[in-house]
């Protein structure tokens, strides 16, 4: 069964992603030194972890569904690995599109590490771990252990000189280099692995009552993990070199707890709202929206307004851009319908 509140939560990540990118690309530099912009960026910082977390959930749910339809665990794991490699391949196609539109050094443009690169490799790791388990709870333990391990070794990976000998394009995947990418496997893969663990629990909830009880437990667990992460941030660091906002496991677990808590929040909201959900529709178009909006926000198409809008103007542009992207997503759906059925269907987008 398709869980609408997961689509809704993905749609929220889409809206937050657009906010983060438009404000970052279009706001004047001297308009960024206030609490409104600062809080907007903190909220925007949850988009990428949200996408990774939800991708892990989707992987686990898809695997469980295939097993129930009679496919062997070996075939299911192979399909999950294949999908991860497709996402990894799409990352390079996305970078190629960016270079064709905006230019620049072709090698650096194609090899720059973006979230799709990290998502693809993280999905591959989750698929391999899923294949190691013989039962659902074995797999959940693998995911939980890997989540904690990736988070805890992140400060060590960032600081160790042992990785200096790696070829630059490989090193960009394990620690960030300015201009070569923001996303790295450490700690970002842990969000997807944590999502896969949550997805395995969700997959076990096969009745409405079971899913309701599970979301209550998710609320308790999310609050506990977030509170523990926040409390641990006040303790002396156990690492020689770490930064709270980038490599700290305490910040990771704070965010992971909030992401887990977002599941019951989305579940409760969607239980109350029974009408059409624009947010769910946005969520189902997340890859398409990501694909087209990044180049519009940062590329040559909007060059004249890069870092030139006041904060109020940037928020207005963000709202208009979001509406336009939703319209583009519905237009894409119309084109797909026309392609599949031979006639254009009304979408009711606006």
State what each model feature region is.
Residues 1-350:
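Alpha-helical transmembrane segments and their immediate juxtamembrane cytosolic regions
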